[in-house]
Amino acid sequence: MNSDLALLRLLQLASPGLPVGGFTYSQGLEWAVEAGWVRGVDSFVGWQREQVHDTLACLDWPVLARLYRACQAEDAEAFGHWSRFLLANRETAELRLEEQQRGAALARLLDGWQLGQAPAWRASLELTQLGGMAWLAAHWAIPLRQLALGHGFAWLEGAVMAGVKLVPFGQQAAQTLLRDLGADLPAALDQALALGDDQLGGGLPLLAIASSRHETQYTRLFRS
Protein backbone atom coordinates (compact mmCIF):
# COMPACT_ATOMS: atom_id res chain seq x y z
CA MET A 1 0.00 0.00 0.00
CA ASN A 2 1.43 3.40 -0.92
CA SER A 3 2.05 6.04 1.73
CA ASP A 4 -0.82 8.29 0.63
CA LEU A 5 -3.35 5.49 0.96
CA ALA A 6 -1.87 4.42 4.30
CA LEU A 7 -2.31 8.00 5.55
CA LEU A 8 -5.94 8.02 4.45
CA ARG A 9 -6.55 4.71 6.23
CA LEU A 10 -4.96 6.15 9.39
CA LEU A 11 -7.26 9.18 9.22
CA GLN A 12 -10.18 6.77 8.96
CA LEU A 13 -9.04 4.85 12.06
CA ALA A 14 -8.53 8.08 14.02
CA SER A 15 -11.78 9.67 12.88
CA PRO A 16 -14.49 10.52 15.44
CA GLY A 17 -16.84 8.95 12.90
CA LEU A 18 -15.37 5.48 13.51
CA PRO A 19 -18.36 3.58 14.95
CA VAL A 20 -16.86 2.54 18.28
CA GLY A 21 -18.69 5.00 20.53
CA GLY A 22 -15.67 7.15 21.32
CA PHE A 23 -17.69 10.22 22.26
CA THR A 24 -20.07 8.37 24.57
CA TYR A 25 -17.51 7.91 27.38
CA SER A 26 -15.86 10.44 29.70
CA GLN A 27 -13.36 8.03 31.35
CA GLY A 28 -13.95 9.43 34.81
CA LEU A 29 -14.00 13.10 33.84
CA GLU A 30 -17.71 13.47 34.51
CA TRP A 31 -17.27 12.47 38.16
CA ALA A 32 -14.05 14.50 38.48
CA VAL A 33 -16.02 17.61 37.51
CA GLU A 34 -18.88 16.67 39.85
CA ALA A 35 -16.41 16.20 42.72
CA GLY A 36 -14.66 19.50 42.03
CA TRP A 37 -11.36 17.89 41.09
CA VAL A 38 -11.55 19.49 37.63
CA ARG A 39 -12.87 23.05 37.81
CA GLY A 40 -11.53 24.80 34.74
CA VAL A 41 -9.07 24.70 31.89
CA ASP A 42 -5.95 24.55 34.08
CA SER A 43 -7.12 21.60 36.16
CA PHE A 44 -8.39 19.88 33.00
CA VAL A 45 -4.91 20.20 31.50
CA GLY A 46 -3.42 18.60 34.60
CA TRP A 47 -5.99 15.79 34.54
CA GLN A 48 -5.28 14.94 30.91
CA ARG A 49 -1.52 15.44 31.04
CA GLU A 50 -1.23 12.85 33.80
CA GLN A 51 -3.06 10.37 31.59
CA VAL A 52 -0.79 11.12 28.63
CA HIS A 53 2.33 10.40 30.67
CA ASP A 54 0.91 7.45 32.62
CA THR A 55 -1.85 5.65 30.75
CA LEU A 56 -0.77 6.39 27.18
CA ALA A 57 3.00 6.30 27.63
CA CYS A 58 3.25 3.42 30.10
CA LEU A 59 0.36 1.19 29.04
CA ASP A 60 -1.65 1.88 25.91
CA TRP A 61 1.10 2.74 23.47
CA PRO A 62 3.59 0.06 24.57
CA VAL A 63 0.82 -2.54 24.33
CA LEU A 64 -0.26 -1.15 20.95
CA ALA A 65 3.30 -1.63 19.71
CA ARG A 66 3.32 -5.25 20.86
CA LEU A 67 -0.07 -5.92 19.30
CA TYR A 68 1.11 -4.39 16.03
CA ARG A 69 4.30 -6.45 15.95
CA ALA A 70 2.32 -9.60 16.76
CA CYS A 71 0.13 -8.90 13.75
CA GLN A 72 3.16 -8.35 11.53
CA ALA A 73 4.62 -11.66 12.75
CA GLU A 74 1.23 -13.42 12.43
CA ASP A 75 1.60 -14.43 16.08
CA ALA A 76 -1.98 -14.88 17.29
CA GLU A 77 -0.82 -16.19 20.68
CA ALA A 78 1.17 -13.03 21.46
CA PHE A 79 -1.70 -10.91 20.17
CA GLY A 80 -4.09 -12.64 22.55
CA HIS A 81 -1.67 -12.28 25.46
CA TRP A 82 -1.28 -8.52 25.06
CA SER A 83 -4.99 -8.03 24.45
CA ARG A 84 -5.76 -9.74 27.76
CA PHE A 85 -2.95 -7.81 29.47
CA LEU A 86 -4.43 -4.49 28.38
CA LEU A 87 -7.92 -5.44 29.51
CA ALA A 88 -6.61 -6.61 32.90
CA ASN A 89 -4.93 -3.23 33.40
CA ARG A 90 -8.19 -1.30 33.04
CA GLU A 91 -8.67 -0.54 36.71
CA THR A 92 -12.47 -0.45 37.04
CA ALA A 93 -15.45 -2.41 35.78
CA GLU A 94 -16.53 0.67 33.83
CA LEU A 95 -13.19 1.03 32.04
CA ARG A 96 -13.01 -2.69 31.26
CA LEU A 97 -16.55 -2.68 29.87
CA GLU A 98 -15.77 0.39 27.76
CA GLU A 99 -12.69 -1.32 26.33
CA GLN A 100 -14.65 -4.46 25.49
CA GLN A 101 -17.53 -2.52 23.95
CA ARG A 102 -15.15 -0.55 21.76
CA GLY A 103 -13.32 -3.74 20.79
CA ALA A 104 -16.52 -5.56 19.91
CA ALA A 105 -17.70 -2.61 17.81
CA LEU A 106 -14.46 -2.52 15.82
CA ALA A 107 -14.55 -6.31 15.42
CA ARG A 108 -18.03 -5.99 13.89
CA LEU A 109 -16.62 -3.48 11.41
CA LEU A 110 -13.93 -5.99 10.50
CA ASP A 111 -16.64 -8.61 10.05
CA GLY A 112 -18.37 -6.35 7.55
CA TRP A 113 -15.15 -6.15 5.56
CA GLN A 114 -14.52 -9.91 5.91
CA LEU A 115 -11.25 -9.27 7.74
CA GLY A 116 -9.79 -10.87 10.85
CA GLN A 117 -12.05 -13.90 10.57
CA ALA A 118 -9.55 -16.60 11.52
CA PRO A 119 -10.67 -18.18 14.84
CA ALA A 120 -7.20 -17.74 16.36
CA TRP A 121 -7.57 -13.95 15.99
CA ARG A 122 -11.29 -13.26 16.14
CA ALA A 123 -11.85 -13.82 19.88
CA SER A 124 -8.91 -11.60 20.82
CA LEU A 125 -10.01 -8.84 18.45
CA GLU A 126 -13.22 -8.45 20.45
CA LEU A 127 -11.37 -7.71 23.68
CA THR A 128 -9.91 -4.26 22.96
CA GLN A 129 -10.14 -1.42 20.49
CA LEU A 130 -6.35 -1.25 20.35
CA GLY A 131 -6.26 -4.82 19.05
CA GLY A 132 -8.48 -4.00 16.09
CA MET A 133 -6.53 -0.83 15.35
CA ALA A 134 -3.23 -2.72 15.43
CA TRP A 135 -4.60 -5.47 13.18
CA LEU A 136 -5.92 -3.02 10.60
CA ALA A 137 -2.77 -0.90 10.72
CA ALA A 138 -0.58 -3.93 10.02
CA HIS A 139 -2.98 -5.03 7.26
CA TRP A 140 -2.94 -1.57 5.69
CA ALA A 141 0.82 -1.00 6.19
CA ILE A 142 0.35 2.03 8.43
CA PRO A 143 3.67 2.69 10.22
CA LEU A 144 3.58 2.06 13.96
CA ARG A 145 4.61 5.56 15.01
CA GLN A 146 1.92 7.17 12.87
CA LEU A 147 -0.64 4.68 14.19
CA ALA A 148 0.21 5.52 17.80
CA LEU A 149 0.08 9.28 17.23
CA GLY A 150 -3.23 8.94 15.40
CA HIS A 151 -4.64 6.89 18.25
CA GLY A 152 -3.31 9.38 20.81
CA PHE A 153 -4.81 12.35 19.02
CA ALA A 154 -8.18 10.60 18.69
CA TRP A 155 -8.14 9.82 22.43
CA LEU A 156 -7.17 13.41 23.26
CA GLU A 157 -9.85 14.83 20.99
CA GLY A 158 -12.48 12.69 22.70
CA ALA A 159 -11.34 13.91 26.11
CA VAL A 160 -11.36 17.57 25.06
CA MET A 161 -14.82 17.29 23.51
CA ALA A 162 -16.05 15.75 26.77
CA GLY A 163 -14.48 18.70 28.56
CA VAL A 164 -16.42 21.14 26.36
CA LYS A 165 -19.64 19.66 27.73
CA LEU A 166 -18.60 19.03 31.31
CA VAL A 167 -16.09 21.60 32.57
CA PRO A 168 -17.21 23.51 30.43
CA PHE A 169 -15.12 25.59 28.05
CA GLY A 170 -15.65 26.91 24.54
CA GLN A 171 -14.48 25.80 21.11
CA GLN A 172 -11.57 28.27 21.01
CA ALA A 173 -10.27 26.86 24.30
CA ALA A 174 -10.85 23.32 23.02
CA GLN A 175 -8.70 23.88 19.94
CA THR A 176 -6.00 25.52 22.04
CA LEU A 177 -6.02 22.50 24.35
CA LEU A 178 -5.70 20.11 21.41
CA ARG A 179 -2.77 22.14 20.11
CA ASP A 180 -0.99 22.38 23.45
CA LEU A 181 -1.66 18.89 24.84
CA GLY A 182 -0.99 17.37 21.43
CA ALA A 183 2.52 18.80 21.58
CA ASP A 184 3.23 16.40 24.48
CA LEU A 185 2.48 13.31 22.41
CA PRO A 186 5.70 12.78 20.39
CA ALA A 187 8.00 12.79 23.44
CA ALA A 188 5.59 10.58 25.37
CA LEU A 189 5.60 8.15 22.45
CA ASP A 190 9.41 8.02 22.46
CA GLN A 191 9.21 7.00 26.12
CA ALA A 192 6.52 4.43 25.41
CA LEU A 193 8.41 2.70 22.62
CA ALA A 194 11.54 2.37 24.77
CA LEU A 195 9.86 0.40 27.59
CA GLY A 196 10.56 -3.27 28.18
CA ASP A 197 7.85 -5.82 28.88
CA ASP A 198 8.41 -5.72 32.64
CA GLN A 199 8.00 -1.92 32.71
CA LEU A 200 4.46 -1.85 31.34
CA GLY A 201 1.49 -0.75 33.39
CA GLY A 202 -0.21 2.46 34.44
CA GLY A 203 -1.99 3.45 37.60
CA LEU A 204 -3.83 6.67 38.43
CA PRO A 205 -5.78 6.28 41.69
CA LEU A 206 -7.94 9.38 41.18
CA LEU A 207 -8.91 8.20 37.70
CA ALA A 208 -9.89 4.80 39.10
CA ILE A 209 -11.92 6.41 41.89
CA ALA A 210 -13.62 8.77 39.44
CA SER A 211 -14.52 5.92 37.10
CA SER A 212 -15.87 3.81 39.98
CA ARG A 213 -17.96 6.68 41.32
CA HIS A 214 -19.25 7.46 37.82
CA GLU A 215 -20.85 4.01 37.66
CA THR A 216 -23.46 5.16 40.20
CA GLN A 217 -23.47 8.91 39.54
CA TYR A 218 -27.06 10.12 39.77
CA THR A 219 -27.07 12.44 36.74
CA ARG A 220 -24.84 11.53 33.81
CA LEU A 221 -24.31 12.78 30.28
CA PHE A 222 -21.85 10.02 29.46
CA ARG A 223 -22.18 6.27 29.26
CA SER A 224 -21.18 3.92 32.06
Swiss-Prot record:
Domain of life: Bacteria
Main location as per UniProt: cytoplasm
Keyword annotations of the record: Chaperone, Cytoplasm, Nickel insertion
Matches recorded under InterPro entries: UreF, UreF_sf
GO cellular component terms given for this protein: cytoplasm
Pfam families: UreF (PF01730)
Coiled-coil region: none
Function comment: Required for maturation of urease via the functional incorporation of the urease nickel metallocenter.
Subunit record text: UreD, UreF and UreG form a complex that acts as a GTP-hydrolysis-dependent molecular chaperone, activating the urease apoprotein by helping to assemble the nickel containing metallocenter of UreC. The UreE protein probably delivers the nickel.
Family that this chain belongs to: Belongs to the UreF family.
PANTHER family referenced in this protein's UniProt entry, alphabetically: UREASE ACCESSORY PROTEIN F
HAMAP family: UreF (MF_01385)
Protein name: Urease accessory protein UreF
Name of encoding gene: ureF
